[in-house]
């Protein structure tokens, strides 16, 4: 299972088989980034949990089934160890534009910055992607990337969709993904379980 946009890969039993964490010094710098905390919240996925700077009940409802729940922390005092990703969530995509510009200017040469959704901007270690993680996952297999198919709906799927033998874009995908991968076939909507119906 590939998680955190490729920063972690686990087998079916949950054992970690690949890891690519953000350097701690970069994480601590990311905590200091200026942003409007009335419009944006900062989160981290780390080896010891999911952390956030403020309580956001609407996020909690998406994690009822898994039991994976955030812990509210003061990031001025929080550690930066074992960080899969630092991510910023806003209600309005426009509120992330200035932050994205800042991140790309100050961290673009040493991190991977990508949207996983229209309102979620994520920062991982340099060269982290689902495509890279998939290539690591296949290292000891008798088949490669070109023997795989993949489905995606976000900008964080670009490398994976481009590197596999056949990539499909969901109908409800981020328009920026469709623009980046115009050559890929578009199929139905996630809500219609199109992947299961098609394959």
Each model region followed by its residue ranges:
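Conserved residues at the C-terminal ends of beta-strands
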Residues: 4, 89, 170, 187
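Gly/Ser/Thr-rich beta-alpha loop segments that engage phosphate groups in nucleotides
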Residues: 6-8, 154-156, 190
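Alpha-helical substrate-recognition element adjacent to the catalytic core
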Residues: 1-25
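Conserved acidic, metal-coordinating active-site core of Asp-based
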Residues: 29, 33, 37-151, 155-160, ...
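Glycine-rich beta-strand-to-loop/alpha-helix junction loops that act as flexible
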Residues: 5-6, 151-153, 166, 170
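Asp-based, Mg2+/Mn2+-dependent phosphohydrolase catalytic module
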Residues: 163, 171-199
